[in-house]
Structures are given as structure tokens and as C-alpha cells.
């Protein structure tokens, strides 16, 4: 078993709404030395929401989720389909953003999306390269042509943080400042040489919202960043055995050219989501949740545990999506992995269960 050692810049993570950069204290942590924790340490309750889909708002394969202004926005990108479906907090369909086409005010594919927590405006990073902005009624407000496609997008206070191809063999983060009217300026924040087998997925945002903060992670880098208007600050720098050799190999070779048993020697950690709770940082990868620098009664501790599978982190919620016929209350054992967590089940009738509609499993995080 490979051991991953994380060099973390932690503590002082409780950032206020002013988004000022916190002060970090760096220290080493070894994930082989840890204590298990109960999920109730970070999850307060679980809600279950049945989505009342309609003929005009059908949900397919959801790749990302946002929650803002009492609305659920689901990005659905799969096999040529590229739409955003919107539901209210009770699960009633409000509309679907579908402008696929080759003409003006249309897109071929949505690469990533975000929703402004304050206004509810929807921001799309699209192909061909452009950013499209819609209000919460799904009316087009703005269309901004770009030089390259962006696979990640996050709405900050005064602009957009954007991740995508910045050169033939490079990826990077740009900051797009949105001025009054049609005024736009773009500046490069950071870039990396792109690996041959980097696996950023279309429709899965590389930016993660946790409470008031935005985090950024790409497999082309071994760092987790705190992102705000025009800045990336390292929160966790990841180290692991033979890192330099692994990175050198991945820059020029594809691990998929190797026999399956040899590929594991060239795997790197992939962070699926990050969140601050209990005075520390929680990172999720490989279906394991690691808590670093978490303040406990006994002092600062490091934890890990097998964790729930979540599609997205939405502020102070982790969200998973299942089809209605897969929702089974018996899977939420109050005496097992969810001990100490209040689960608010719903009862589905036969018609709902057989509908194929989606159900949101919402894990509400503790403050």
C-alpha cells in the first residue's frame, strides 16, 4: 500500500465573508497515522428530496450540482446532452437551460458551470470557447467570447476564476474581471504543463465551494488552492513516494499504455472535494475522507474514514444523486455508519419509485 504524505498549510481556515487570505501554519501529516471518526462528527442530518421531473425538465446523468437562492441547479452532460435543470427547494421543476446549437447565443457543450450564491445567476464555461451568463429565470444576460475553452469556472466577488487550456501543452487558471457594461479583462494567474493522462472530466468543476470559500484542485498540480478574485493560495501541498519520477513519467507517457498491474505505481492523489470543519481541513479522495488538523477536545488530531459517495459539495452540504428505484431507507442504518445522524426519510409511492426520477441525498454538515 502506498502512503501519501501531505504538507498542509492549515489553521486559520475560518475565513469571513470579506474573503481576506487567512494565515496558515505549515506542517507535515502522514495519512498512515490516523484515527477513525464517526460521520456524525461532521454530518448533522440527512435530507432526501424527490425531484418532480416533467416532460420539459427531464434529468439524465448529473455531473455537478449547485444550490443557491433556494434552488437546486443540476448540470447534465452525457452523450451529446448538455443542459442545466433547475428545481425549487421542494423538488418542483422550475425550468431547464438548453441552448445547444451552432448559432449565436447557443453552445455545443457545457464544460463547467457555477451559480452565484448572491444573485442566483448561472455561469457556463462552454464550447466553442465562451462564457455565458443567465439570470435565475434562465434569460441570457451576457455572452463573452474566449480564446480557449474553460473546464472549470467559479464566480468570485468581482469576476470569474477560470481553468482550462492556455496553450497547446499547458493548462492554467485565468481571472476574468467583469466590469460595467461589456468591459472584460483577463489575466493569467497560474499555469502548469499538461500531463498526457490528466483526467479532468467535462462537466465536473475543478473549483469547489465550501461555506464562504472556493477551493481549486487539478490533477496537473499536487496542490490544493484557496481561490478568490485573481489569487490562488496554497492550502495543501501534496507529497508522495517517488513524486518527481512519477510526475516526469506522466508528463511524457500515458499510464494506460502500461499493463494494469503496473499503472498503480504512477497513480497520484485526486481530491474530489475539500471542506473546512472543526478548525481544520477535510479532503476526500479514493472514497476516503481525511480530516487534517481538526481541533478535538484532546487537541489537534488527524482522522480518516471510509466516506459516503457524494456527487458535489454545495456550500455546507454534500449531495449524492440516485434514481428513485435505488432509494432504500434501509441503507441508512441509524445503528451503523450513520449512528448519531438524524435522517429525514421520505416515503415514495409505487408511481414515484417506478418513474426513474432522481432523488437527492443531502448530507447537511455541522457548523
Name what the model sees in each region:
Residues 14-16:
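C-terminal motif of bacterial Sec signal peptides marking the signal peptidase cleavage site
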Residues 20-51:
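Blade/loop signatures of beta-propeller domains
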Residues 47-82:
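Beta-strand-rich domains and repeat architectures in extracellular enzymes and scaffolds
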Residues 52-56, 92-119:
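Blade-loop segments of beta-propeller domains
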Residues 55, 98-106, 145-151, 189-195, ...:
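Short coil/turn segments at the loop-to-beta-strand junctions that recur within blades
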Residues 61-64, 108-113, 148-155, 198-205, ...:
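Repeated scaffold domains used in trafficking and secretory/extracellular systems
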Residues 109, 125-169, 185-195:
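Asp-box/WD-like beta-propeller blade repeats and closely related beta-sheet repeat scaffolds
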Residues 236-259, 290-323, 327-328:
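Conserved blade-ending motifs and adjacent loop-strand segments that build the rim/top face
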